[in-house]
């Protein structure tokens, strides 16, 4: 085993020197042993391997990175593998990558995405991250609208707990937003994407503008230096408002308008928001950063602890690491690991295959199938993975409950070497399906309890939640006739694309258009009360000036913007009559997370409407619809970094390859294929098209409708079709999956839609048309 690596030095915000790579692995010869791929004699349709992970499919792409859904071969646990091409990163980008890595390695909180393993070659870095199967909070809001305050409180307590934990470790996130909040299989929060995070010291100011403009604190727009935590506190206020109201407190048709509204500090309070919640917001959204509450103070707030009077939210106390769990140790010994290397890897925080196996054995599976895991013996070719830093990663919802059937639709990854195939011998062990007390700090019974989500996935409603009834009306408050965001009809009309400026491709994320149009029709006109801040900053125009040595955009975030199979994000409403909302799209620079180095471009664009970017020849702006738009008036598309004037790259316009068992498959493979059954979806509320028809009949109906709409399709699995519509290279081109799934505990089947590539609007148009024409 190699010795512990020297930790990365603290990086200055302005420092742009080339970081040394020696800390990643001082022995280049060991790198070649870190990866084992497929034996050339294995079947052609077998998925490639990286280390102990079988790659299942691509779930995100960027200019310099890619994310693959993978399965840990030894334990069967699903993970996300982020593949970063180091040769494409400049020195500044490498610095931020290493800083992100260092930060992720010291964070052990149950509501923060966890790093498992790092594998490095000379040109490529493979990062194995925790997998959150529930998708983004953003997608949940898109599909369901605002949360009731009880649900919002459960989520927000977890968010505050995790962010306060970061602050007590002198780490500031700087990019908190609904898109960076994930949900696991039990609907618990997982904070992701620490690419803009940094270490702070009170008295040493940070001076870089970074973050997403709608969530950015006013002092960032003014170009002031910051301590750090106060900008996270402001962003948390925006998040709380978004959870409870379903809209952003500050928006505008362009960056200049947004900036003016943030600096004015005025926002609308919807009538249904409780007084306690309104009072809490006033502690977050204070223009003067020195007067904003600390998170320790926020934890004691009345609204935060409603229903938790005997369990007041307190700072999380990280439990002592558990490096000697006898159950996991014995399991690993039975796989072929020695007790000495297990202890050395854990105590030394190697982040190698040994540590990853130990951690994964302690993690609860996101699978629906049960409490058993199949363990395989360790491969004979020993691996020693480098203890390299690892960036944060956006984890994704599972796309397959059966690894035998999953075939990757894009198996091209950087530098996957070949190696001997794995042993076929396996042994089954009944293992607890819960997380034991372990070194990651994910112990539910620690000194400060981690806020739990009271909403198990199977109890989710399929329809959009009704308006909250816990309104506190004040007769002394002037009320507007506009609603912040309750027009649910538009939820079925827009779709989302996720990503970050100049890195994430449109195909890195699926889109959504799921909601019931009937809900908003029955709603009375909503009223609002207004609240304005008492501090009015100078009305300067534009964003703060930049210097030539400001930070440049980080390269490591694109793969993190890809909860591809979010249960709430990929199902199409059958209603398609509501108007499209595009005044606040996710795919434009005005909503992108960026560093100060990008401000020159931003200033050039700040007078453009949100729906138009200079890169988009076809972008057209719709008139601003006031405060009454749906969440799609804020979030209609994800960030797109590819210049839309450029044609689709070959990597994006993939030719669909059949992955069904054909003439090259064995008789056993063919038999397994014939006997395959629809997989069960954990979240019943993600099913929008349900039927009591037999799965085979549903597949025939789907193919019939696809043919009628000139859509090409190929059988990817027994009950999954890969579909294509439009002309490659054109805006109407879209690829998506249609899968027949079983609803747990019900005698019904449903159809799941998931976008693979193409614009969100193109996907929405064809998917809505198909959903409407299906006769199920």
Curated annotation (Swiss-Prot):
The keyword Cell membrane appears for this protein: yes
Taxonomic source organism: Mus musculus (Mouse)
Entry binding sites for ATP: 59-67, 82
Annotated compartments: Cell membrane; Lateral cell membrane; Cytoplasm, Cytoskeleton; Cell projection, Dendrite
Function: Serine/threonine-protein kinase. Involved in cell polarity and microtubule dynamics regulation. Phosphorylates CRTC2/TORC2, DCX, HDAC7, KIF13B, MAP2, MAP4 and RAB11FIP2. Phosphorylates the microtubule-associated protein MAPT/TAU. Plays a key role in cell polarity by phosphorylating the microtubule-associated proteins MAP2, MAP4 and MAPT/TAU at KXGS motifs, causing detachment from microtubules, and their disassembly. Regulates epithelial cell polarity by phosphorylating RAB11FIP2.
Enzyme Commission code: 2.7.11.1, 2.7.11.26
Active-site residues, record numbering mapped to chain: 175
Catalyzed reactions per annotation: L-seryl-[protein] + ATP = O-phospho-L-seryl-[protein] + ADP + H(+); L-threonyl-[protein] + ATP = O-phospho-L-threonyl-[protein] + ADP + H(+); L-seryl-[tau protein] + ATP = O-phospho-L-seryl-[tau protein] + ADP + H(+); L-threonyl-[tau protein] + ATP = O-phospho-L-threonyl-[tau protein] + ADP + H(+)
Highest taxon of source: Eukaryota
Tissue: Highly expressed in adult kidney and testis, lower levels in heart, brain, spleen, lung and liver. Expressed in the head and neural fold in 8 dpc embryos, the limb buds, telencephalic vesicles, eyes, branchial archs and heart at 11.5 dpc, the ectoderm at 13 dpc and epiderm, hair and whisker follicles at 15 dpc.
Polar residues biased stretches: 27-45, 417-431, 465-483, 492-501
Domain Protein kinase: 53-304
Domain notes: The UBA domain does not seem to bind ubiquitin and ubiquitin-like and might play a role in regulating the enzyme conformation and localization. Activation of the kinase activity following phosphorylation at Thr-208 is accompanied by a conformational change that alters the orientation of the UBA domain with respect to the catalytic domain.
Compositionally biased region (Low complexity): 508-522, 565-578
Record protein name field: Serine/threonine-protein kinase MARK2
CDD domains reported for this sequence: MARK2_C, STKc_MARK, UBA_MARK2
Biased composition (Basic and acidic residues): 432-442
Gene: Mark2
Domain UBA per the UniProt entry, residue ranges: 323-362
First-tier enzyme category under EC: transferase
Quaternary structure and interacting proteins, as annotated: Homodimer. Interacts with PAK5; leading to inhibit the protein kinase activity. Interacts with MAPT/TAU. Interacts with MTCL1; the interaction is direct and increases MARK2 microtubule-binding ability. Interacts (when phosphorylated at Thr-593) with YWHAZ. Interacts with YWHAB, YWHAG and YWHAQ.
Topological type in the membrane: Peripheral membrane protein
